[in-house]
Amino acid sequence: MTDKKVIVLAAGGTGGHLFPAEAVAVELRQRGYDVHLVTDERAQRFVRCFDEEHIHIISSATFTRRHPFSLIKTFWMLLKGMGQSLALFYKLCPVLVGGFGGYPTFPPLIVAAFMRRVTFIHEQNAVMGRANRVLAVFVSAIAGGLLSQNNRYAHKTVLTGNPVRDVVLNAAEIPYYPSEGEKPFHFLIFGGSQGASFFSRIVPEAIALLDDNIRQRLRIVQQVRGDTEELIKIYRQMDVQAEVAPFFDDMAERMARSQFILSRAGASSVCEIAVIGRPALLIPYPHALDHDQAANAALLARVGGAQIISEKDLNAQRLASLLTEAFCAPHLLEKQALAAKKVGQPYATRRLADMAEALIVGRSLSDVKEEFFDENAA
């Protein structure tokens, strides 16, 4: 057993929940804490920054509206997870327990709150997820990635931002260059794991409607899901320069090189666009729970850093018109890029760690908020 103070971080077993937890864990370890992860069995293929001794798999389940038997099973799994969490906390004696979303955070955070441990949750989106909505009542603090501080828990909400990768921070150093004259116009399209197929259909249809001189300047980079060969063939027939792939290792760099981005509005996408500072057309995924993507996009649009169009209102003609407008107004895109960058939160990982340490030593959240506000204003 180590003499270091123990912090337990809980996260759902998907990359979206685990990445911010891992980023904060690395930062807290550098500050001398012994950090453990509580998650579910899905996490094995995503976890990168924890060794086996520091990963604790607990029972959990997602609430559904299906058969009553499913509800009984869910309650049983959550109760089992609470028992496992209780045993773990008696063993580790954590000074802080933090949650990063997903139902596996529910048992440990509830148990920690009733044990009167210091607790926090991190909400990536502008709208709280279902597990976090319940946990918000019990925890000591709420760290907001995109969540407004003007919510019903404003007294304990601190705007920290969402942790972004180091490659994103490096890309943020690259200034935005408008495409003027006959310079190439770099157009980046990505849809994340949800709804990329919509872009695979509508983007080439829109490109076909553009004037020849615009198509000649276009340099397309498009992330797709399963339509790669067909899309490459379509762009080749139109004589449009395009790179099409299911995944790009250097996505942050490609974002930085782009003049315009077409994207969904997941929390990580919106935050990376803002930190790097690029103009974007955001199409919220219409089937997202709680319509969180629409709320995420609205935050960037409100400051003039992006445009929003719902999927049902976007067709090939509309997209072609918007692309033509973007070509003809390079300095307007430059203004959008600057507006987006002003609301980016590049120091989110450090701020989350700062907030965690403040909670451990009993500092008031109002002091933490004031400190972060002064940093933003500087």
Swiss-Prot record:
Its main location: membrane. Pathway: Cell wall biogenesis; peptidoglycan biosynthesis. It is a peripheral membrane protein. It is found in: Cell inner membrane. One of its GO terms (cellular component) is plasma membrane. It catalyses: di-trans,octa-cis-undecaprenyl diphospho-N-acetyl-alpha-D-muramoyl-L-alanyl-D-glutamyl-meso-2,6-diaminopimeloyl-D-alanyl-D-alanine + UDP-N-acetyl-alpha-D-glucosamine = di-trans,octa-cis-undecaprenyl diphospho-[N-acetyl-alpha-D-glucosaminyl-(1->4)]-N-acetyl-alpha-D-muramoyl-L-alanyl-D-glutamyl-meso-2,6-diaminopimeloyl-D-alanyl-D-alanine + UDP + H(+). Its EC number is 2.4.1.227. UDP-N-acetyl-alpha-D-glucosamine binds at T14, G15, G16, N125, R165, S193, Q293. It holds the Pfam family Glyco_tran_28_C. The keyword Cell division applies. GO terms for molecular function: UDP-N-acetyl-D-glucosamine:N-acetylmuramoyl-L-alanyl-D-glutamyl-meso-2,6-diaminopimelyl-D-alanyl-D-alanine-diphosphoundecaprenol 4-beta-N-acetylglucosaminlytransferase activity; undecaprenyldiphospho-muramoylpentapeptide beta-N-acetylglucosaminyltransferase activity. One of its GO terms (biological process) is carbohydrate metabolic process. InterPro entries: GlcNAc_MurG, Glyco_trans_28_C, GlycoTrans_28_N. It is an enzyme of class 2 (transferase). It comes from the Bacteria. Keywords: Cell cycle, Cell division, Cell inner membrane, Cell membrane, Cell shape, Cell wall biogenesis/degradation, Glycosyltransferase, Membrane, Peptidoglycan synthesis, Transferase. The keyword Cell division applies. Belongs to the glycosyltransferase 28 family. MurG subfamily. Cell wall formation. Catalyzes the transfer of a GlcNAc subunit on undecaprenyl-pyrophosphoryl-MurNAc-pentapeptide (lipid intermediate I) to form undecaprenyl-pyrophosphoryl-MurNAc-(pentapeptide)GlcNAc (lipid intermediate II). This is UDP-N-acetylglucosamine--N-acetylmuramyl-(pentapeptide) pyrophosphoryl-undecaprenol N-acetylglucosamine transferase.
